[in-house]
């Protein structure tokens, strides 16, 4: 596989029917979460992770099956009506981000000329940056609209709470990485990248 590009195109917003202003507020909250590491992080924070498809999130929030959800970008949550029933979104989110990747087979990559590869990489970066800028602007516009209307409380965690959640996540990552040599290799690569990028 040859990677043309990958990256997060938006900052997710956490959907919630209850105010979650810091890690301690997760205690007992039923959170829709992907299985695996994400669920482990929420569990360690005191939440009760519930695994379900993203398409089931609205109905589960509406019926009280869950209280909150690791779901999508603010604009997507708004378009899907999430804020009509979950009036305490956390933005910027405190969890995973949506990732876009574009890969091609190594055999295909080897057949491309240098100019074709540059064109493909340039196209991807332009499309990716356009999408990222679009969602950043749209999310900010919608957050400003919702704050002004006063019907939704947009919660922005203070730095110390974000740092506390990050430490919980790092502990979960390290424990998972101890499970196999391959997991440790991936963990080390990610931690190295995050430190280099100033994220850790």
Predicted feature residues:
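N-terminal secretory/targeting leader peptides
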Residues: 1-200
